[in-house]
Amino acid sequence: MAIDLPGMGRDKTPIQDVKMKSTVEKICQLIDGIEGKVILVGHSKNGIMISQAAEYRPQKIEKLIYLAAYLIPNGKTQREYSARDEGGWLKPYVTQHPETNSHTLHPDIYKQGLYHDCDEDITEMAKCILSNEPVESGFTPLHLTNKNFNSVPRYYIECMEDRAVTPFIQRVMYTETPCKKVYCMNTSHSPFFSKPKELTEIFCDIAELQ
């Protein structure tokens, strides 16, 4: 199940009103309505969202899967780690919008920065659906405890050709915050488009692990 987080996709929350707190609350509300435990997958920046959700609902989450995602320790922010990722391709193409506390990525970098191993129609689709990203969550420190967050097993899927969240920073993160298992894919930042079958097989493998 993939959901539209606040301000994203079909969710019409004004982007200036989107906060990390409301995003995590939406995830928690969703899993509260599902019988039994769930496995949460976070991609890219949304790694911070599933981490914070695990802190609030550890009893409802069976496993956490970080897909080329920000895996940030307690008290740190996503922005601190993205600043360390000097090899990423996206930063020169980011435009800040202070009036809405958001930023956008210039379409010129979509193909080479996000989808270089994907079909051309994926890039064209992205031009239609990618929009402003809220800034606030990137500067919000995570509040995680050993009792809650660290009680949920973590798995990492490293994208070896990622130009958005580079392999360098991915390895820094899963080294500093160890996971039960790390999988590697020879893909860009978007393996759900370039190698969906291989990604699905990894998801299934993680789901079956005890």
Label every model-predicted segment.
Residues G7-I39, E55-Y56, R79-A83:
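Active-site loop/oxyanion-hole signature of alpha/beta-hydrolase fold enzymes
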Residues T100-S151:
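Conserved alpha/beta-hydrolase catalytic His-Asp/Glu region
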Residues F193-E208:
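Post-His helix in hydrolase/transferase enzymes
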Residues E55-Y56, K60-H103, P107, S137-G138, ...:
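Flexible "cap/lid" loop of the alpha/beta hydrolase fold
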Residues N132-F192, P196-K197:
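Conserved serine/cysteine hydrolase catalytic core
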Residues V41-N46, I50:
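Gly/Ala-rich beta-loop-alpha elbow adjacent to hydrolase catalytic centers
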Residues L5-G9, L71, S188-H189:
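Alpha/beta-hydrolase active-site loop signature
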